[in-house]
Amino acid sequence: MFAAALLSAATASAQCTGDGVQLYPAPGGIVPTNMRLLLEGVGTAKSPVLGLVGKPLKLVSTDHEVKLKVTKGWESTLGRATVILKLAEPMQPDKRYFLNLQEVLPNVSLLNGQVGAQPSWLSGKGPDAKAPKWVKRPAVSEGFVRRSPQGIARFVKLNLALREESPAFLVVKLSPRRLGLSPQQYLLPVQGNTAYLGHEACGGAFALEDGRSYRARIEAFDAAGNLAPSTPPVDFEAPSAQGP
């Protein structure tokens, strides 16, 4: 369906992320007062993150606290897991809220935040109650393969567009077209109208086998958890690492 391309070492989607956690929406941004936080554990941080389910967490500003309920989200077979942090009440507008991760995950690195600083977000003017709308439904545009000393990274690039002001995310249920194999389901952040489905050489979100046919059922939502309308599944073949 598409040609596989060898990625350069500088290609971000093929790099090994390393052990630690990632927060979505990414720390530092402006978020709706009813945002829903996603906390991903990568590598050795996967189990500690899953261990937070049911434990009390909170967002703290100078004069307001919001309790967070931690529920299980999605788990990858390649060393990743994401939990959902739901706000017990909305944040107050125009305030900076902090999450003390070191209190519950000591000595765990934050991979998408400022080094040495508590992750924080600035609350916006109000809640986000409007669901995202599709401008361009997801489609696979190309496949990428990169060989390195650690192994093979393999991705497909999803092109899409949503009418949505806050950060958007996909939950993909990926099923091999061959019967008898279990589906995979995991989270993908949308970055600049694209999302990368696949795996790095040392782990990742989805295991793609060389040249295998897949069907991806895609669900999109925004930072507040509002769901976009359903969209047809996407069929594709995983890129092959075999040269011509």
Features from the language model and the residues they span:
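Solvent-exposed beta-strand/loop surfaces of large extracellular or lumenal domains
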Residues: 62-78
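Aromatic sugar-binding surface patches on proteins
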Residues: 76-85, 190-203
